[in-house]
Design a protein with these regions (language model features):
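Short glycine-rich, Thr/Ser-proximal phosphate-binding strand/loop in the N-terminal lobe
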Residues: 12-61
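Glycine-rich, N-terminal phosphate-binding loop and its surrounding beta-alpha-beta segment
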Residues: 47-94
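A short acidic Gly-Thr/Ser loop motif
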Residues: 6-11
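Internal, well-ordered alpha-helical segments in soluble enzyme and binding-protein domains
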Residues: 111, 129-132
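Conserved phosphate-coordination/catalytic loops
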Residues: 61-64, 123-127
C-alpha cells in the first residue's frame, strides 16, 4: 500500500510517499514560498534511485500549482517512483483542528465543515489545509484522505494541568 504524507504550511508544502506496511520512504518533496510569482522553490528527491532536483525562482502562486508539480514529478520518467497517481492508496495530513474532532479521522465533509468552523482560530493553517485537501479531492477523488489533528495531543494532558 502506498501512503502519501502531506504537511501543509502557510506558505509551504512537504510530501513523502511511503510503501506500507514496510514504512519504506520512496520519495520526498518540499515547496517553499507558495504564493510567490518568481521566488518559489521546488525540491524533489527519489529515495529509491537517489536522483534529486531543485528548481528555484518558480511561479507557484497557489497550493494547486504546487500539488500538480509534485504529482508530475512523482510519475515522471526520470524521477518518478510510481507509474500512475492511481497507485496512491491513502493520503495523510497533519491537520490543525476541526470543531468536534480530535485524533485521527477520515476527512469527510463533516470533518471539513468543522475545519471551516474553526477558521477564525487557525485562519492561516486551516485555510491552507482546506485548499490542499480540496485539490487532492479533485485530483484523486477515490483516494481516502486522513487527518491527524494536532489537538489530539492536548486530550492527554491531565485535567489538573490544563489552563
Amino acid at each position: 500500500m502506498k501512503v502519501l504524507a502531506a504537511n501543509v504550511g502557510s506558505t509551504s508544502l512537504k510530501f513523502k510517499l511511503f510503501e506500507m506496511p514496510e514504512e519504506t520512504a520512496l520519495c520526498e518533496a518540499k515547496i517553499e514560498r507558495v504564493g510567490s510569482r518568481d521566488k518559489a522553490i521546488f525540491a524533489y528527491g527519489s529515495l529509491v534511485t537517489g536522483k534529486r532536483y531543485r528548481l528555484e525562482g518558480q511561479c507557484i502562486q497557489d497550493y494547486t500549482t504546487g500539488i500538480r508539480m509534485f504529482l508530475d514529478a512523482l510519475v515522471s520518467w526520470e524521477y518518478g517512483v510510481i507509474k500512475s497517481v492511481g497507485e496512491i492508496d491513502r493520503i495523510g495530513f497533519k491537520t490543525v483542528l476541526s470543531k468536534g474532532f480530535y485524533g485521527v479521522h477520515e476527512l469527510t465533509d463533516e470533518v471539513m465543515d468543522g475545519m471551516r468552523q474553526y477558521l477564525f482560530i487557525a485562519p492561516v493553517h486551516n485555510a491552507a489545509y482546506l485548499e490542499a485537501i480540496g485539490q487532492f479531492n479533485s485530483l484523486l477523488p477515490d483516494v481516502p484522505k486522513i487527518g491527524v489533528f494536532e489537538t489530539a495531543f492536548h486530550t492527554t494532558i491531565p485535567t489538573e494541568r490544563r489552563i
